Amino acid sequence: MVFQPLISKDLGIKLRDGTFYAQAAFSAAREQGFTAGGHWVVNNGGMWLQDGELSGLDFVMSYRLQNHHWQLGAKEPVMLRIASLNNLFDMQNITADLQGTYPYSETAPLTLSNVGMDILNGHLSLSALRLPQHDAAVLKLSQIDLSALFTVLQPKQFAMSGKVNGELPLYLNNPQWLVRNGWIANDGMLTLRLDKDLTDSISESNTVAGAAIDWLRYMEISQSYTKVDLDNLGQLTLTSKVHGVNSQKNSTRAVVLNYQHKENLFQLWRSLRFGDNLQEWLQQTISLPSASSLPSASSLPSASSLPQGISSQPTAPIPTRAKE
């Protein structure tokens, strides 16, 4: 590829196929100064990445430079289409459009629109993002497959299956928040399975905690709602309420789990160690001060015999989720 020498080796990108076309014109005059314009076109591009592969890249950009300002997509938006991107996650049908002025201003904004992709057997999209930003751009999750997600992340201590939906309002210039009052909820039945070695380890270290954790070894979740907040330092806060049953123990006894988790998302993304954090939370939360409230082997646990954050109650009816 003739353009390969123009790409830094540090990027780990190796061009594979595709066609590239560009046209440019410029002028310099005493009164008008320097102006330029043109367009770039990439058809069916493909490349090897440092940790993956990209194929089916189509890119069209028209531009104009005048008075130190770039006009992007003067007649039609800058268009990006990618058929497939295989990296940490497999993504298909990626779309994005960009139009406006850079540097942007209130009178000459820059707008990112039509952003979407198919990912994890579901779809992810972003509402129009206008810069300068006044309103949140909403990242919408539709039927994201947890089984596909956990297959990629491979946490050791637990696994989940089923699909979820969600909406995450994104802020780029908020003094505190990147995501505020987002939510993720189940789309149909979910299942949760805790690792046997994890639950056995907790049971051996604390018999009371073991009685409670036994109800979480396997859960069929009928209702799950998680509030999501993320500050601009990367501090992620998840506040969840889960209703389900352990059909392997008693399908008529509901288990309600209230769970709050805090994590630095930037560090978490680097480590992807979800399971270790869950184990730490379980060990800290499912601990009672004494064994006096441990139920007998022949009896079902009551709400008072479970630790704070977990309760057991008749399944019918399960209360409607309260608005956050």
Residues of each region from the PLM?
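Membrane-proximal interfacial segments on either side of biological membranes
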Residues: 1-113, 122-324
